[in-house]
């Protein structure tokens, strides 16, 4: 169950000093990528940093990194045990996400970081991460429709919730590709609290050294946000370009336009594309990539799709699917530490695909938790054509976990 509010997390953090400055990142899409760019820049600049993003990728502790490296399970469990004890002793009744946030901040205190890159979990104003006492910069990425039952039914209402991460006197970087109405809401809130808004800009000597064609449009905007925020937060002498450039060129963010092999699962020679697009705006960005780089003329694309229960599925499928495509519907498994998250039944996904003009012969219902069979069907249906796995970050996690297990078994017998 999701319970927004700051009283429980504030109590939980009373004994965890925040000696580090935070770059706090909110938004609908692009938050994780911005955080990854920022971590890479801080590491290249030799700033000891931590990062906290959600959801986790494969294991619960991989959502917390120190100097861009996931922490060990031992460190995570030690910090978590202390947080759980405080929660019990003080009868706080904190939520799962509040406990995770407090665990991350406890790790950061122990590891004596200088700067923390913190991704908002949901919204901004009442999100547990907003209990931080010290922020250097806040960032608001692209705003889209998602989690409307918690944040509001319009972009402007959602923007107002995201703007709640601002602090007086702390600059706020805003993705300049946001709609004017969204920018106005954010700027109005900034004026109310006496704050400055800085629109992201792709005009800089740093970005001039990079080729925009090597990035998707959304990635380029995310990089502009990260670079703008970095230079507002980084108060040391200018970080040399020769150190920053490789950090950006080598940065990868799993589950976002990620190309990988599923040979160990299906025997497929060619790569598949993995993307966690789970709302209409993210699906449109994925469509651009698929149409420009994978789909040839009227060639079919084979999709493996899962979605969280309650998502507006037609909004996700409309940009992606064409009548000649094939769709394997699958459910992701239980999400560790997030019992309120449930997968949409596969029958709903195949029905939605049928409504997009894809006949039943081109759809496969893999049932609950049978990702391996969905991938095998997709491999056979695609032939030499492209395969894309999308619709949920939890599906991304399931696939990466399945690959890890397959590779582990393979290594035992090789």
Show which residues each predicted segment covers.
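ATP-dependent carboxylate-amine ligase catalytic core
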Residues: 6, 10-18, 44-133, 151, ...
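Nucleotide phosphate-binding/pyrophosphate-handling subdomain across enzymes
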Residues: 19, 115-116, 128-139, 143-146, ...
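A conserved segment at the C-terminal end of the G1
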Residues: 21-24, 33-51
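Extended acidic/charged loop-beta regions that coordinate divalent cations
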Residues: 103-150, 183-216
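Membrane-proximal helix-turn-helix segments that form the acceptor-binding/catalytic region
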Residues: 159-167
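C-terminal helical cap/extension that packs against the catalytic core
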Residues: 177-194, 198, 267-273, 317-386
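Glycine/aspartate-rich loop-and-adjacent alpha/beta segment that forms the canonical ThDP
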Residues: 393-414
């Amino acid at each position: 169950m999701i319970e927004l509010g700051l009283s429980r997390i504030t109590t939980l953090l009373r004994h965890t000093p925040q000696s580090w400055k935070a770059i706090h990142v909110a938004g609908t899409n692009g938050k994780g990528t911005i955080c990854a760019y920022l971590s890479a820049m801080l590491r290249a600049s030799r700033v000891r940093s931590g990062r906290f993003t959600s959801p986790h990728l494969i294991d619960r502790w991989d959502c917390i990194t120190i100097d861009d490296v996931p922490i060990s399970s031992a460190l995570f469990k030690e910090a978590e045990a202390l947080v759980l004890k405080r929660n019990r002793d003080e009868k706080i009744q904190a939520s799962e996400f509040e406990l995770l946030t407090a665990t991350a901040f406890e790790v950061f205190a122990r590891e004596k970081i200088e700067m923390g890159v913190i991704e908002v979990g949901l919204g901004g104003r009442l999100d547990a991460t907003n209990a931080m006492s010290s922020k250097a910069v806040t960032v608001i990425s692209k705003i889209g429709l998602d989690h409307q039952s918690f944040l509001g039914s319009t972009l402007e209402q959602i923007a107002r919730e995201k703007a709640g991460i601002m602090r007086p006197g702390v600059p706020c970087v805003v993705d300049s590709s946001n709609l004017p109405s969204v920018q106005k809401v954010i700027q109005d809130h900034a004026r109310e609290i006496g704050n400055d808004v800085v629109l992201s800009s792709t005009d800089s000597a740093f970005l001039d050294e990079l080729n925009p064609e090597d990035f998707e449009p959304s990635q380029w905007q995310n990089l502009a946000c990260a670079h703008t925020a970095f230079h507002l937060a980084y108060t040391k002498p200018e970080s040399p370009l020769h150190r920053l450039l490789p950090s950006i060129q080598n940065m990868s963010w799993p589950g976002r336009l990620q190309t990988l092999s599923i040979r160990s699962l299906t025997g497929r020679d060619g790569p598949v594309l993995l993307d966690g697009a789970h709302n209409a705006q993210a699906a449109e960005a994925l469509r651009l990539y698929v149409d420009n780089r994978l789909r040839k003329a009227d060639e079919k694309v084979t999709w493996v799709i899962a979605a969280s229960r309650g998502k507006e599925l037609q909004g996700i499928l409309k940009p992606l699917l064409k009548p000649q495509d094939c769709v394997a519907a699958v459910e992701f498994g239980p999400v560790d530490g997030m019992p309120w998250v449930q997968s949409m039944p596969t029958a709903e996904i195949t029905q939605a695909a049928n409504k997009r003009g894809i006949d039943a012969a081109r759809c496969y219902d893999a049932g609950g938790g049978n990702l391996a069979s969905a991938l095998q069907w997709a491999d056979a249906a695609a032939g030499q054509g492209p395969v894309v796995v999308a619709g949920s970050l939890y599906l991304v996690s399931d696939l990466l976990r399945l690959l890890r297990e397959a590779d582990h078994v393979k290594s035992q017998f090789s």
